[in-house]
């Protein structure tokens, strides 16, 4: 007898499944925090995956206190520069950017991404921001940062990736004072996160172009009788006669991949600059060798190698850190096949 249970194939939660507008993922919210002001996010470039041998520190686990093998993702994280301070106010429709103050210490490569002012009056811009903060019109302070991929050999581009990053804290004045101290400076990932820290990871997934409904949605193949008529990898029906239109819920061919996805509560197992501990013989496939600061994230992250990966303080975690993990060994076995 046939089963009476047949859930739909594929999730409608991410519809419409269309290409991301940019390869830079965007965080639409930042966690509220009463901690000291500092950057709430960072960015790096995906290198590849390997595995580590570590001591299981999950309480009440069956393997607690013993060595276990854990898959990890390597992300190269060169220093980022703080280019500007942005103040937000509120209007009828919500938050709106009301003022910015750009530094005059900008890298030459930034002109490849956007048009920069030749002689910005930094002091005048900061005075305007300070007036908005003192008057209470500015209710939030964020920083505009950018990466420098030209310092990496594994990422074949020179154009920086510009993004907006939140600042922790509840006092707007304290956040503004912190922003003034880091404006125009280079920030390392060690200034933002620690070993064992829980973070949210966002990236643009690997693109697969146009795919059919079987691969895109996971529907079943048609039976042999239909395949002889040329209908093997198609949906059984597009819908009823009435209403006389095709519903958006019907699985159809279209774009697959290159969507923004966010992984919540990923753990940073290690942050280091000792590249000999992770570089395999022959380098990583489609990337090469790690030559600077890097981190090891437990598990996988979205996107292919060389893809920009953004990190953020967790928004849905009950704990912000589990403690520093004890790593016994990092596999450097060649990945060349």
From Swiss-Prot:
Single annotated GO MF: rRNA binding
Gene3D superfamilies: 3.30.1430.10, Ribosomal protein L3, domain 3 (4.10.960.10), Translation factors (2.40.30.10)
Record's keyword terms, sorted: Ribonucleoprotein, Ribosomal protein, RNA-binding, rRNA-binding
Stretches the record annotates as Disordered: 1-32
GO CC aspect terms: cytosolic large ribosomal subunit
PROSITE patterns noted in UniProt: RIBOSOMAL_L3
NCBIfam families in the cross-refs: L3_arch (TIGR03626), PRK04231.1 (NF003261)
Family statement drawn from the similarity comment of this UniProt entry: Belongs to the universal ribosomal protein uL3 family.
Protein's job: One of the primary rRNA binding proteins, it binds directly near the 3'-end of the 23S rRNA, where it nucleates assembly of the 50S subunit.
Name recorded for this polypeptide: Large ribosomal subunit protein uL3
Taxon lineage: Archaea, Methanobacteriati, Methanobacteriota, Stenosarchaea group, Methanomicrobia
Gene name of this polypeptide: rpl3
């Amino acid at each position: 007898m046939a089963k009476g249970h047949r859930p739909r194939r594929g999730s409608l939660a991410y519809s419409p499944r269309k290409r991301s507008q940019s390869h830079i993922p965007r965080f639409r919210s930042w966690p509220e925090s009463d901690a000291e002001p500092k950057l709430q996010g960072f960015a790096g470039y995906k290198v590849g995956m390997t595995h580590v041998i570590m001591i299981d520190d999950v309480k009440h686990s069956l393997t607690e206190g013993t060595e276990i093998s854990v898959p990890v993702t390597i992300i190269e994280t060169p220093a980022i520069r703080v280019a500007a301070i942005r103040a937000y106010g509120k209007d009828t429709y919500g938050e709106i950017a009301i003022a910015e103050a750009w530094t005059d210490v900008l890298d030459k490569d930034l002109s490849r991404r956007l048009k920069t002012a030749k002689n910005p009056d930094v002091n005048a811009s900061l005075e305007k921001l300070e007036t908005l903060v003192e008057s209470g019109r500015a209710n939030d302070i964020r920083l505009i940062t950018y990466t420098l991929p030209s310092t990496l050999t594994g990422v074949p581009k020179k154009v920086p990736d510009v993004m907006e990053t939140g600042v922790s804290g509840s006092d707007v004045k304290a956040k503004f004072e912190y922003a003034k101290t880091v404006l125009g400076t280079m920030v390392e990932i060690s200034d933002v996160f620690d070993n064992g820290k829980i973070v949210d990871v966002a990236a643009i997934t690997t693109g697969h172009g146009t795919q059919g409904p079987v691969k895109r949605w996971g529907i079943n193949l048609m039976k042999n009788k239909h395949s002889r008529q040329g209908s093997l990898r198609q949906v059984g029906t597009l819908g009823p006669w009435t209403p006389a239109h095709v519903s958006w819920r019907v699985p159809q061919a279209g774009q697959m991949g290159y969507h923004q996805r966010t992984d919540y509560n990923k753990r940073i197992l290690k942050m280091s600059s000792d590249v000999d501990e992770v570089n395999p013989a022959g380098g990583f496939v489609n990337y090469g060798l790690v030559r600077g600061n890097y981190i090891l994230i437990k598990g996988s992250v979205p996107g292919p190698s060389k893809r920009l990966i953004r990190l953020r303080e967790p928004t849905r975690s009950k704990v912000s850190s589990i403690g520093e993990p004890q790593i016994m060994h990092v596999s450097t076995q060649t990945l060349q096949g």
